[in-house]
Amino acid sequence: MGYGRDQQYNKSNFNSRGGDFRGDRSSDRNSYNRDRNDNFGQRGGNQGGRSFNQPQELIKPNWEEELPNLPVFEKNFYQEAESVKARSDQEINEFRREHEMTITGHDIPKPITSFDEAGFPDYVLEEVKAEGFEKPTGIQCQGWPMALSGRDMIGVAATGSGKTLSYCLPGIVHINAQPLLSPGDGPIVLVLAPTRELAVQIQKECSKFGSSSRIRNSCVYGGVPRGQQIRELSRGAEIVIATPGRLIDMLEIGKTNLKRVTYLVLDEADRMLDMGFEPQIRKIVDQIRPDRQTLMWSATWPKEVKQLAHDYLNDPIQVQIGSLELSASHNITQLVEVVSDFEKRDRLLKHLETASEDKDSKILVFASTKRTCDEVTKYLREDGWPALAIHGDKDQRERDWVLQEFREGRSPIMVATDVAARGIGMYTNFFFQFCIFFTTN
């Protein structure tokens, strides 16, 4: 049974709010509005009737003057469970050793071992349990107490380790402790991500776990018309997930602002820097009050990411799962074959025959360039394989369609550049590296 040989994939038949931590948010909002400095951030994205043709350059506020005029906000919500308090240092060290966990910093909370120990409000726990999760991942066990404590933190862990929930759930708790948004307010939680696909995946998690609290979110990324995104921002969203370039566009034309941001997440910071987003990240972060809580997540820990953390995080605590260097996942069996360019096609087809013996398999083929991506897809389709391509030159509608076809198994082979495939967030049985990349990532 296989994609090209049987039934489903026969090539001959294939057509080319509520709960704890909230307090009285209505009265808090009135207090916030009275105390707010109306001049703050005026040149950093205030919604003041600008047109699309008149973007204004973002200018960093004078925080020494502005910060004393801003209302204080709550960010420490962690209450250590009695069962966690009772664990000895030996037990904690053994737990961290089992999870290949390294911590850096002072006064770091002990890890939890169950969802109940995290101390989340009932409305969060109900959402988690409804998803059928049995226990937290390693990064969540340590990351949740760190994030809920209100400290700036760094999490270094591989993609797929559960890091999205590590910052998403504490972010929901953070939002519900703040005053309600008023008309014209920007988000409370801002998540920066390197790619459209990852941003959309993060939005799905935020929507899923924020629904019971009626928390609104907006996903802002390039490659699509701005109209729908502007409408979402104008209606108000407690969470904004954004790629850096499009967010700056929205700030410069005055369609949102960062006055209310008190919880900032930099997801896949290493990849954002690899893609050249450092100037945009710095421009954005400079617009946010410096006493915010900042959470930085990265798969690796190169010097460029360290410098960014040094510049924008205040006395951070760090958790790292596994080695600081990139290494092969223990959950993946790898086979390396060195062949000539002439042999690549036939060898790929041979492996596809084997991989497709399970008709439910999903196969991801990596190519180093957009051109190679299209070429590989073309000859696979010519040979009868149901393959589709995804890369940065595809418009967002086509990218979404390709991902949906792949996710639902109608096109179980996807050929992608590594950047486009980042953050796909779905189970894949087989990966084929058609080209060797020239970066360690």
Curated annotation (Swiss-Prot):
Residues 7-16 have a biased composition (Polar residues). Residues 19-38 have a biased composition (Basic and acidic residues). Residues 1-54 are annotated as: Disordered. Keywords: ATP-binding, Cytoplasm, Helicase, Hydrolase, Nonsense-mediated mRNA decay, Nucleotide-binding, Nucleus, Ribosome biogenesis, RNA-binding, rRNA processing. Residues 347-441 form the Helicase C-terminal domain. One of its GO terms (cellular component) is cytoplasm. The Q motif is unique to and characteristic of the DEAD box family of RNA helicases and controls ATP binding and hydrolysis. Associates with polysomes. Belongs to the DEAD box helicase family. DDX5/DBP2 subfamily. This is ATP-dependent RNA helicase DBP2.
